[in-house]
Amino acid sequence: MEEKEEGKIRINKYLSDAGVCSRREADRQIAAGNVRIGDAVARIGDLVMPDMPIYYQGRLVEAEEEPILLVVNKPKGIVCTAQKKEKDNIVDFLHYPKRIYPIGRLDKQSEGLILMTNKGDFVNKIMRSGNRHEKEYLVTVHKTASDSFLRALAEGVPILDTMTRKCRVERIGKRSFRMVLTQGMNRQIRRMCEYFDYRVVSLKRVRIMNIRLGDLPTGAYRKVTPEELKRLEQLLENSSNDTVRFDSSAIDQQLWEEEE
């Protein structure tokens, strides 16, 4: 139970809610003596009020920000990274007035739905493949997609020294089909198709869990609706969130696996 006194929360949750790091990483930093509450060194399990001065690795933690969760229709050619050294990074492309990060990735030549947020819990819970959250894609290949090919995709394909999970595959055209995955491996869909000598010529993500791209124009973004956010939080309620560290220096290394 997070709240033991009215208005107070555990310090690891405070740091996670502020977008500083995951709760597990917060506990590590607290144990290492890198978190202070005012002038006092914090201890694991300490309770804090939102207006208390909290210092993380010597820096004052800003007051909790209003949660931001954006639905973005990423164009081809944009890279899902927060690193400024990448000239086509999605943060500069979007030019949003507040600090946000992409949740997962789509490779540079793919397009469609990417979520962006300032909340560490969203990143951690959606990213963790063990939570088996659904992601839906529209795929077009370079030649006629045979029925046997589509069935084989659905049953699982050996790539990257493992067998992909079974997934849903539905034909929508002679060369196009819909795929619903519950995992995210590096260039997963492209590798799965290449295994059967099919080349992906178009890949578009249209859904993450209950969030749909809909008719959002390419390159545009919108905030999730209150109804979408409520349902998303319900779906994430029992999800683990302690495997991905949420910080700008490590985010590209941590999010590699979601590149379809």
What are these model-derived regions, one by one?
Residues 2-260:
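Basic, flexible Lys/Arg- and Gly-enriched helix-loop patches that mediate nucleic-acid binding at interfaces
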